[in-house]
UniProtKB/Swiss-Prot annotation:
It comes from Salmonella paratyphi B (strain ATCC BAA-1250 / SPB7). The keyword Coiled coil does not apply. Catalyzes the conversion of pppGpp to ppGpp. Guanosine pentaphosphate (pppGpp) is a cytoplasmic signaling molecule which together with ppGpp controls the 'stringent response', an adaptive process that allows bacteria to respond to amino acid starvation, resulting in the coordinated regulation of numerous cellular activities. InterPro entries: ATPase_NBD (IPR043129), GppA/Ppx_hydrolase (IPR050273), Guo-5TP_3DP_PyrP (IPR023709), Ppx_GppA_C (IPR048950), Ppx_GppA_N (IPR003695), PyroPPase_GppA_Ppx (IPR030673). Its EC number is 3.6.1.40. PANTHER family: EXOPOLYPHOSPHATASE (PTHR30005), RETROGRADE REGULATION PROTEIN 2 (PTHR30005:SF0). GO terms for molecular function: guanosine-5'-triphosphate,3'-diphosphate diphosphatase activity. Belongs to the GppA/Ppx family. GppA subfamily. One of its GO terms (biological process) is guanosine tetraphosphate biosynthetic process. Signal peptide: none annotated. This is Guanosine-5'-triphosphate,3'-diphosphate pyrophosphatase. The keyword Cell membrane does not apply. Pathway: Purine metabolism; ppGpp biosynthesis; ppGpp from GTP: step 2/2. It holds the Pfam family Ppx-GppA_III.
Length: 493
């Protein structure tokens, strides 16, 4: 592999040190290595902001691991940044001097505002939707809040509160009591209050979280079969569960890993304060943050206003997809959707996910014609899909698995991107679109009327079409039978 195509971004955070190594290929990035080590640098700061020798040694030990990987990458293509703890530490110079010797490249201590800007760029490059957004990143010693639209930020704030510092300040007795949560939330709201008006002034339509706390919440909700939207009600529910556990060392929540458990209560308290103070309705997980912002900055790639479309194009190119056929199926599925939208009330994001499934439905053919839907589902589950959340990836994989042959209803109910009923509806439309576009020519797609009454679908074809298309009739009859097996009434006329 040509080393000139490799790039590395290292984030010396207050809780963890992270390294991301990517390969640049045809204007997009391919992740090669992700290494994360819990260093808890912020825990080594005393009241005089002096960083302990033990904390520094933990950091240097981690950097020795990173240094081995950096030997393969040209120095101009490496960026190392340090954040809140090393902004605060009075003896940061000592740590940084040795860090630079270990890594063999410069270490830059960035301002809170620059950290917020880079986080936003990482989100903008990897997270779907170009609407006005609020980005929240709870770090070990600072929390960044950024508003913006597309690639442009409108406000940037870095606040002195984080999951490690709040752990040491409000949960130092390791007691998960209501009083400790109350104190932690009140303190976080006090920190937020001076910037809340400006954030609300700029406004947002969507809110995304880019931190370990939000990642932990996503893992918990996936494990417990909830949908992926984080809400205040869910946060309060998890807080009560933590309080029931009593002590930090006894904290057990389904889906919460041991690695994340230590700073989870403090991060949860900060997030509850943010939701409450800013009246956030819901939040989803971002696709990237600081490290992705660093990488895309080195590559000087413009932010694609439609990240999902870029992702679909890259995958289609990689797996040699017949894009004419993909577009034909998508056009037909969209036509069906418009005909039933008054009855089914499918939301715009669900429509977008249906059309994404149409664009990807044939990627399994790149493996083998036999069991192509299984191959397609496997690929989508395991590919990196910038712009799509983990739950959305799971839905796409489930739709591709069920694009033909008998329906696996349980798989449609096990995804949590959309309600089970909506997943069933999207699946039905996808299957019909694939069936009627099967001859791969626009002029051979018949005029089809589709009507929905509750879950009953009535499909009307031109009067003599079935008589002149015996194979088509056989395929439609088979599809009607398969749908009837899972109690999806389909009447063909």
């Amino acid at each position: 592999m040509n080393s000139t195509s490799l790039y590395a971004a290292i984030d010396l955070g207050s809780n963890s040190f992270h390294m991301l190594v990517v390969r640049e290929a045809a204007g997009s990035i391919q992740t090669l290595t992700r290494i994360k080590r819990k260093v808890r640098l912020a825990a080594g700061l005393n009241n005089d902001n002096h960083l302990s020798a033990e904390a520094m040694e933990r950091g240097w030990q981690c950097l020795r691991l990173f240094a081995e990987r950096l030997q393969d990458i040209p120095q101009p293509q490496i960026r190392v940044v340090a954040t809140a703890t090393l902004r605060l530490a009075v003896n940061a110079g000592e740590f940084i001097a040795k860090a630079q010797t270990i890594l063999g490249c410069p270490v830059q201590v960035i301002s809170g505002e620059e950290e917020a800007r880079l986080i936003y760029q990482g989100v903008a490059h990897t997270t779907g939707g170009a609407d006005q957004r609020l980005v929240v990143d709870i770090g070990g010693a600072s929390t960044e809040l950024v508003t913006g639209t597309g690639a442009q930020t409108t406000s940037l704030f870095s606040l002195s509160m984080g999951c490690v510092t709040w752990l040491e300040r409000y949960f130092s007795d390791r007691n998960l009591a209501q009083e400790n949560f109350d104190d932690a939330e009140k303190a976080a709201r006090d920190v937020l209050r001076p910037v809340a008006d400006e954030l609300r002034f700029h406004g947002w339509k969507v809110c995304v979280g880019a931190s370990g706390t939000v990642q932990a919440l996503q893992e918990i909700m996936m494990a417990q079969g909830m949908d992926e939207r984080i809400t205040l009600a869910k946060l309060q529910q998890l807080k009560q569960r933590a309080i029931q556990c009593g002590r930090l060392e006894e904290l057990e929540i389904e889906g919460l890993t041991l690695e994340r458990a230590l700073v989870f209560p403090s991060g949860l308290a900060i997030l509850i304060a943010i939701f409450t103070e800013l009246n956030i309705q819901s939040m989803t997980l971002a696709g990237g943050a600081l490290r992705e912002g660093l990488v895309y900055g080195m590559l000087h790639l413009a932010v694609d206003q439609d990240i999902r479309s870029r992702t679909l194009r890259n995958i289609q190119r990689r797996f040699i997809v017949d894009t004419d056929q993909a577009n034909r199926v998508a056009k037909l599925a969209d036509n069906f959707l418009k005909q039933v939208e008054n009855a089914w009330h499918i939301e715009p994001i669900s429509r977008e996910l249906l059309l994404s499934a149409c664009q990807l439905h044939e990627i399994g053919l790149s493996v083998d014609f036999k069991q192509a839907p299984y191959h397609a589902a496997y690929l989508v589950r395991h590919l990196d899909l910038p712009g799509y959340t983990p739950a959305q990836k799971k839905l796409l994989a489930t739709l591709l698995l069920n694009q033909t042959n008998p329906v696996d209803l349980s798989s449609l109910h096990q995804q949590n991107a959309v309600p089970p009923r909506v997943a069933e509806q999207l699946c039905r439309l996808l299957r019909l679109a694939i069936l009627f576009a099967g001859r791969r020519r626009d002029d051979l797609v018949p005029e089809i009327t589709l009507q929905a009454l509750n879950e009953n679908l009535t499909l009307t074809l031109p009067s003599d079409w079935l008589a002149h298309h015996p194979l088509g009739k056989e395929l439609i009859d088979q599809e009607s039978q398969w749908q009837s097996y899972v109690h999806w009434p389909l009447d063909v006329r």
